[in-house]
Structure formats: C-alpha cells, structure tokens
Amino acid sequence: KRKSSIFNAPSRMILEEKDYSEANKLSKQFGLGLSKQSWNLIPKIRELDLILRSKRKTKIYESHPELSFQEMKGAFLEFKKKDKEGVKERSNILIHNNFKASFIDEFVNKNIKEYKPDDFIDACALFWSAKRTINGLELNIPDQPSFDSEGIIMQMKI
C-alpha cells in the first residue's frame, strides 16, 4: 500500500539543531516529531531559508511534484514513485499532459548511477506547475496564503 508522499516540514527553530535526536525532541515539544526524511533535508532547507529571507521581493514559489501529478491526473496516484509501476504511471501522466513521449522515455531509461528517473519525472511535474503559475492557471494551496514569523508566504502553487 502506498504511503503519504508529503511530510511535515520542520519549523525554523529546528534548522539550527546539529543532532537528529535533539531536533526530534524539540519538534515534538511543538507538535509532531521530525522524520528522518525531513532531517536529511535540513541542509537544503537551511540554504533555501537564507535565500528566502535575503530576497524578499523576489517571487519564489513553492510546489510539490506529487500534488502536481495528482492535479494532472485528477485523482490520487496508485504507485510509489520509485517503483517501476510508479515511474510508468507518472510518465504516462506527463505524456497525457503534453510532454513528448520520446523526451520522457529518453531520460527515464537512462542507466546512469548518479541519475534517478523519479527525480527527472518530479522535475517535469514541477515544470508543469511553474508553467501553470506563469499563465495564471495555478491551484493555490491553501487558497488564501498565510505567512510565517519572518513574513515569508506559506502557500504552494500547483
């Protein structure tokens, strides 16, 4: 059975923690614990947080590939993105949303150690959402944005 593809992002105070167990303990004090998956993303989240705080007037939007695929399909996805069936399911969704089959197949079937087909497919889904946003066709989640303690918008564009 497929699990949720979306996990809670850590709060800003967690970004300064150097140890997973301490970060998890702190996170639990303010709600949910911190998953290992979230913890492994901390360096990139920290880097992005610095960019967002330093470039407040720049339009930087958040999105999520699994929500993009769900919106393209009009339904929940059936398979995990890293499974063969999941790659095929997502490839077909992209093809049905105006991506060329030859383009998708070329990159999905590459056999390169450092290259993961699901990362390429996710990038295509994010491109789809970015194009919708540029054209004013995006789905906003939530409809009305909220802002964090630094005044940074908390809303995804799908």
Give the positions of each predicted feature.
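Phosphate- and other anionic-substrate recognition elements at nucleic-acid/protein interfaces
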Residues: 1-124, 129-158
